[in-house]
Amino acid sequence: MTRRLKAAIIGSGNIGTDLMIKILRHGKHIDMAAMVGIDPKSDGLARAARLGVATTYEGVAGLIRLPVFADIDFVFDATSAGAHVENDALLRAAKPGIRLVDLTPAAIGPYCIPVVNGDAHLDALNVNMVTCGGQATIPMVAAVSRVARVHYAEIVASIASKSAGPGTRANIDEFTETTAKAIEAVGGATKGKAIIVMNPAEPPLIMRDTVYTLSQPADEEAIAESVERMVAAVQAYVPGYRLKQKVQFDRIDSPLRIPGVGDALKGLKTSIFLEVEGAAHYLPAYAGNLDIMTSAALRTAEHMAQRMLADATVSA
């Protein structure tokens, strides 16, 4: 049997519970060991207990006191940006070498988009999964960037209001700031901008994302092909990720002024329209925004664990 590394999840809300179900069903190198919350009556903690997972409602302090903590190598943090800073400090003091996968916009560690730069951070002690909008759209910005220099990229992430829990709502500013920075740092754009829309429609609509880039003039077919290859790569761990329609192009011949970028920009505008349907492991299918976050987090941790296990085998 393949050896697996034990993991804990901090945050027993929508994201944490969905991630737990994914690990229990699909974990190859990661084993679900503990669920951490602060509400003793939360559905996530109750569900974890029924599934035989160790639980605590006393936060990170409670996790550290659990007997299983001695065996835990990974912690997924699905709380909030502010809480993650404190959680990282407490865990690092208790176990300096523990790996944290941050599903909040705190961004203590490097930004990680599995299909773009996941392999660059396999040895990092803390990696940041950016945001749901970032996980959905930054691969598209990167797909354009590998064909032509991107001066500016703007993304609009539309999610069902019902899929946005208190953690998401408390982090709106951090969402836009972290996503914009990651569009630049990981996506390769000179300047990035992010907008989130919470759609109150009933019945709830699945996640939809729009990506606009302004790049140097380039071969449109090459960009379209690059986008399609990137979509296929994301679908390897998020099957519900897909293009809503063909990539659209517009030649910009009149100079544009983009603050922070330049005053006389011309080039190629690329418009990419996406939708993300969730796998419905715990949450409804319309919550593709949460599904892509938990899927990306597990993908990242699996690759990190695989590296750790391989290194341990070599050392032995």
UniProtKB/Swiss-Prot annotation:
Catalytic residues of the enzyme: C132
A molecular function (GO) term: acetaldehyde dehydrogenase (acetylating) activity
Keyword set includes Transmembrane helix: no
Binding site for NAD(+): S12, G13, N14, I15, S163, A164, G165, P166, G167, T168, R169, A170, N171, N289
Alphabetically ordered keywords of this record: Aromatic hydrocarbons catabolism, NAD, Oxidoreductase
CDD domains: ALDH_C
Reaction it catalyzes: acetaldehyde + NAD(+) + CoA = acetyl-CoA + NADH + H(+)
GO biological process: catabolic process
Keyword tRNA processing: no
EC identifiers of the protein: 1.2.1.10
Similarity comment: family membership: Belongs to the acetaldehyde dehydrogenase family.
Protein name as it appears in the record: Acetaldehyde dehydrogenase
